């Protein structure tokens, strides 16, 4: 018996070791830029000289972000697609669940796609989520769930965040679906950005069709498992609970089901184009980074807003290539303010390499950590979405960005970036440091310094996973 147990233990140990080695070592072998995709970029028109059919509204406020989501869901007549990396059954996540549940009760078809890790962490035991998932016309897909069959692919996550309504409008950005990013909370939050896109051409908008096609592809991936909620013995009470939450939302926001000023409250754009990294749960070609590099080829000024920077040598080469012909500015959270310890720690290790690319860096001391991901290319193009300037977003995760040809949006975001720069410590490529007019210095306490000193050593072998 002891020999059998010993053999079982050895087999389990070897399997666990294999899982760890595959998940740590495989991401080290990053895919190179895709030549076929490079050709596609050259054949794609990212600008137009006249206004197109798709109109936009830029959402930078967390409470407004919740309101627009509720309006979109509340006015849906036929179909809703919600794809999100991190949905939680907290206060504002539950408000979304309640709105979706009410829409389902009216016969609206709902498809909900969630990343497998966060579904397991935050929704598996949620009665509200199970109640919604058990509705007849609600389908739930879980991307790359954490199961024995998927253990060798645990690194490949779905980082998308978008909402599609009735094939006539969508919202896409960097916000997750929880209290950190939605609602009127004032503590423990992040700032972020969404773009609401309204199509005036009755479902023929170019980027809307691109996003719908993308969703169909990822929904049909073999790594997506279909889940159906289990209605509990108290499911009637739970349905009533969600309806009560929705009723309270209608009292607070009177136009959730009657709002109709979509065209009036949005701005025209010349063109919107969706770019992405692919849908498979596997190593990705760096398509989003390729697109940013291509769009910046003839630029004179490029601003990159990212929560943090975690680059390999190939990514540093891209930044250096941009800085060789353009003024390159990178705005990121200061270590003293950032909410991601891995990103902060890697910055401490890699700061000199980032500056060596020729980029000027702005260490932002905002009131709240900034989770926004955006690239401004001269005064016309804005690239907005879920892509962080790190190896995970570049080579491992699914990512979506919108390339928007709109001088007005570019100016709006540029104004926000100017304010962020005033709240930052500017570090020029030559090492010269200057505090912005609104910069408020914060000193790390000894515990935080010690914590980062330890992490600086620990993360070196696994920085490709952060």
Question: What role is predicted for each listed range?
Answer:
Residues 145:
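Short loop/turn segments at beta-alpha junctions that line or gate ligand-sensing/allosteric surfaces
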Residues 2-138, 148-156, 165, 169-466:
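Charged, low-complexity intrinsically disordered terminal segments
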Residues 141:
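Phosphate-binding P-loop/Walker A region and its immediate neighborhood
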């Amino acid at each position: 018996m002891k020999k059998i147990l010993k053999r079982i233990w050895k087999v389990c140990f070897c399997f666990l070791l294999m899982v760890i080695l595959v998940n740590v070592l495989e991401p080290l072998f990053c895919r190179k830029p895709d030549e076929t995709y490079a050709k596609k970029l050259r054949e794609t028109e990212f600008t137009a000289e006249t206004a197109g059919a798709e109109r936009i509204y830029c959402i930078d406020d967390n409470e407004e972000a919740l309101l627009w989501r509720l309006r979109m869901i509340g006015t849906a007549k036929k179909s809703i697609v919600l794809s999100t990396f991190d949905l939680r059954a907290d206060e504002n996540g539950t408000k979304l669940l309640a709105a979706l549940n009410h829409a389902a009760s009216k016969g609206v078809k709902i498809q909900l796609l969630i990343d497998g890790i966060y579904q397991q962490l935050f929704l598996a035991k949620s009665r509200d989520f199970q109640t919604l998932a058990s509705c007849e016309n609600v389908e739930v897909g879980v991307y790359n769930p954490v199961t024995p069959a998927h253990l060798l692919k645990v690194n490949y996550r779905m980082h998308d965040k978008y909402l599609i309504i009735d094939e006539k409008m969508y919202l896409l950005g960097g916000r997750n679906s929880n209290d950190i990013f939605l609602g009127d909370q004032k503590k423990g939050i992040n700032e972020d950005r969404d773009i609401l896109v309204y199509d005036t051409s009755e479902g023929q908008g170019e980027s809307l069709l691109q996003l719908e096609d993308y969703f169909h592809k990822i929904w049909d991936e073999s790594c997506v498992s279909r889940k159906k909620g289990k209605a509990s013995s108290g499911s009637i009470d739970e349905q009533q609970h969600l309806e009560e939450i929705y009723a309270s939302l209608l009292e607070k926001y009177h136009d959730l089901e009657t709002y109709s000023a979509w065209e009036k409250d949005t701005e025209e754009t010349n063109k919107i184009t969706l770019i992405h990294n692919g849908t498979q749960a596997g190593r990705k070609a760096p398509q989003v980074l390729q697109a940013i590099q291509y769009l910046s080829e003839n630029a004179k000024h490029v601003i990159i807003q990212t929560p943090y920077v975690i680059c390999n040598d190939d990514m540093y080469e891209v930044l250096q290539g941009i800085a060789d012909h353009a003024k390159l500015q990178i705005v990121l959270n200061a270590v003293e303010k950032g909410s991601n310890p891995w990103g902060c720690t890697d910055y401490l290790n890699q700061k000199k390499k980032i500056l060596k690319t020729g980029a000027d860096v702005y260490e932002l001391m905002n009131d709240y950590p900034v989770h926004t991901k955006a690239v401004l290319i001269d005064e016309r193009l804005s690239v907005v979405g879920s892509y962080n300037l790190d190896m995970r977003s570049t080579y491992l995760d699914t990512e979506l960005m919108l390339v928007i040809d709109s001088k007005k949006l570019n100016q709006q975001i540029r104004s926000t970036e100017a304010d962020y720069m005033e709240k930052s410590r500017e570090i020029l490529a030559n090492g010269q440091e200057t505090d912005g007019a609104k910069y408020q210095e914060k000193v790390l306490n000894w515990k935080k310094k010690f914590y980062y000193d330890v992490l600086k050593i620990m993360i070196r072998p696994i920085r490709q996973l952060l």
